[in-house]
Curated annotation (Swiss-Prot):
Protein name according to UniProt: Conantokin-Pr1
Claim: Metal-binding is one of the keywords in the record: yes
Top-rank lineage group of the source organism: Eukaryota
Modification type 4-carboxyglutamate: residues: 4, 7, 11
Protein family according to the UniProt entry: Belongs to the conotoxin B superfamily.
GO cellular component: extracellular region; host cell postsynaptic membrane
Cofactor note: Adopts alpha-helical conformations in the presence of divalent cations and is unstructured in the absence of divalent cations.
Function: Conantokins inhibit N-methyl-D-aspartate (NMDA) receptors. This toxin has highest potency for the NR2B/GRIN2B subunit. It induces sleep in 10-day-old mice when injected intracranially, and hyperactivity in 24-day-old mice.
Subcellular localization: Secreted
GO MF annotations in UniProt: ion channel regulator activity; metal ion binding; toxin activity
Expression tissues: Expressed by the venom duct.
Amino acid sequence: GEDEYAEGIREYQLIHGKI
């Protein structure tokens, strides 16, 4: 999206249970 970095973090948190 417009902020791929933020989306990447979002994906990571969803997958890894919010670090």
